[in-house]
Amino acid sequence: MSHAVTIEEPQAQPQVSQTRYRERSRAGSHISSNRAYDFLYDPLFIVSSEKDHTQANIQATLIRSRLRKVPRFKTMFSNLIHYPRYSLYWSKSDPVPPFISREWKGHKEKHREALRQLTTTDASFQMPKEVYEDPEVTGKNRYKYFERPFLPFFQQMPFNVVYAVSKAEPYTFPPTSTKHLSIPSKSTVGTQTDYRDADVQTDPYSAEYVVCQDSIPELLTLATLTWGRGLPAGQAEVEMIERAREKRAWEASLPALSDTSQFEKRRKMMNEMERKEWAFREQEIEKLQEIRLEVLKELLRKREENQNEVNMKHLNARWSKLQEGKEAKMAKIQRTHVSTIRKLVGKRKNIEGKLERRNIIKDYSDYASQVYGPLSRLGCFPDNNSEDFVVKNYYLNTYEGLVELESCLPDFVTQPQIRAPKPKVITTKAGFLKRAARLDYELAEVHKALLDKKNKVLEVKKPPRFLQRNPIPQPRLPTPTLEMTSNEEEEMEMAVIYLQKLLRGRVVQNMMFEGKEKRLELIQELRTCHALQEDEKLVKKAEKQVTLALQRQRNLHEHKVSLVENHLAGLEGRALADMFDFLSKELVRLQEERRIHAFVMLAERQRRVREAEESGRRQVEKQRLREEDEIFKEVVKVHHSTISSYLEDIILNTEANTAEEQARAEIEKMAEKINDIAYEMESRRTYLQSEEIVAELVYSFLIPEVQKYFVKEKVRNAQRKHILAAHQIIHSYTESMVQKKLTEGEQDEASNAAMLLEKETQNENNS
């Protein structure tokens, strides 16, 4: 909404005092820039169109809402949707009295503007007089004419300050910085805004005016020209004003309508003026078409130039790319060619493969030989120790040395003076060319002609690559001829031609009638504009008044209907908005609920999958731990059994050795005693006693010993499989050795047993 403040005459409308509306919000209070119903009461409040007037009415209705909230005591503290805390009802109290018109004031202005335009087109029409209310300059409105303009940035300065001579003030040292900086009383702050000056430009101000009676100012005929649409005026606007003046002069020269004798002259003048206007309109249309055609040609030309430029860029890029590829391939081929030629030359130097002795004199005489330039691929690097020969100079390797060396240089080295060369004089004092200059010019022309002739290439017309077909012109159609065989056919042909003429004329008449029926309203309008009789004028005026009354009645009815529709639409809109808001929130809630449910299901599924995977991993880990525990137990058990068996064997062997030693000692003692007793008994025994001793030895010693040996062998054979299994688990690779040892032990035991049996038998035989 645009607020334009102009000075108008106060209209006779009832003023209703209103206080400035204060709009309160949750954040705090806010004072609006205008009152709610200023568009109805304030004569200085102007809107640009009926749309803005309707918008202001809607805003006032929304601000002063007539909907009232009535609390429900049963569900006053409820937050549920189906148990609302309050209900809405429409208040019957209207802040605007019924006698205040809510229509837009612009209709009256449009009606007044239409009357003004009618006065410019029809000189016979008299504009109704406007009665202005007394401004009461000497009465109650006198104070308005003593108000001076307020200039916010204007400040009157005394003349002694304006014309004072500026004096140079002595320099004063700034004071020492204190602990706290002084805060200036005023500060200038710059701001930047997104708005431009063009966004706030309005039409220039035009003051109010009063038209004198029986006068039509020429300036009012230019009311259609506005700023940016005809203003500032150009050549076209000046020509339009001149044509309007000529037309007004022509209308003034027309004969009066009351003079019936000049009716034919008036009609001819109007026809001529109409033809001139149509001719001028055709010229304007042709000019516009030519301008549009030129603009179209220029656009097409620019588009073609841009397209050609883009195509040339693509072609140049493609050509440069192909050229680079070609040059790279050529360089590669050249390098390959040189390398191949060098290899062929090296091979052909000694085709027969003879061994030649080195010619030292030839090598040292040839500076291209390997003596002076050895090949690095053979392991020779002539510049390997080149750094040993680098000269280290203080004046060249250090900055101080360079500065000292530069200070020793003369000035013309560091500060050169460039002198412009003198121009070569090619003319004499008389103004003629010198002979040398003329000869140089002639030689340059001859050289240029020779170069042009040398570089000129005869363009050979290339034969076409494919066969081209020469177009054969189409033969012309033969001229039709009509041959009449008899007079009857000729008469029939003439009758047909005449019938065709009648049909064409009838068609033209029908087209004219249809055009007249289509443009009947325009014809009636032209007839009303150029009515000839006073009675018809009165009739037209009465019809016009009736039409205006009907229009006002229709506007009033439409305004009332629009108000009712606006209120109903507002109620429907609020109800639909609440309903749609509730439905949208429910839809969002259901969607969120479904989405959350889907997330829950997905999370539950992932949790189950992870639990299954974790349980599987846990079972596998437990199984692996059990297997490792069993393996560890078995290994420990085997180790313990091995150690216990090893210790047991050691203890048993020790016990056996100790017992054997003790037994041997005891046996030796007993043997000595027995030997003594035996010698004593041997000296005293008889044959029967000897037989009895042998039998007792056999039955009491030999047979129990053999039985004891067989029992031990059975026990050893029973334990042997367990020992073999333990040894196979621990020492699988020593199985063969153990087997050999066992077999050897068995053989030894068998041999020992056999030897014992043999000894026993020998002893028996000896006894």
From Swiss-Prot:
Its keywords, alphabetically, are: Cell projection, Cytoplasm, Cytoskeleton, Differentiation, Mitochondrion, Phosphoprotein, Spermatogenesis
**GO CC, alphabetical:** axoneme; mitochondrion; motile cilium
Classification via Pfam families = CFAP91
Per the record, the domain of life is Eukaryota
Name one process (GO BP) from the record: cell differentiation
User: How does it get modified post-translation?
Assistant: Phosphorylated by PKA.
Positions of the region Disordered?
1-29
Asked whether the UniProt record includes Mitochondrion among its keywords, one would answer: yes
Kindly list any coiled-coil regions of this protein: none
Task: State where the protein is found.
Answer: Mitochondrion; Cytoplasm; Cytoplasm, Cytoskeleton, Cilium axoneme
Keyword field contains Mitochondrion: yes
Q: How does it assemble?
A: Interacts with MYCBP and AKAP1. Part of a complex containing MYCBP, AKAP1 and PRKAR2B. Interacts with CFAP61.
Could you say which disease the record links this protein to? Spermatogenic failure 51: An autosomal recessive infertility disorder characterized by asthenoteratozoospermia. Spermatozoa exhibit multiple morphologic abnormalities, including absent, short, bent, coiled and irregular-caliber flagella. Abnormalities of the sperm head, base, and acrosome have also been observed.
Q: Which family does it belong to?
A: Belongs to the CFAP91 family.
Q: What PANTHER family does the database record attribute to this sequence?
A: CILIA- AND FLAGELLA-ASSOCIATED PROTEIN 91
Report the protein's function: Involved in sperm flagellum axonemal organization and function. May regulate cilium motility through its role in the assembly of the axonemal radial spokes.
| Protein name, per record | Cilia- and flagella-associated protein 91
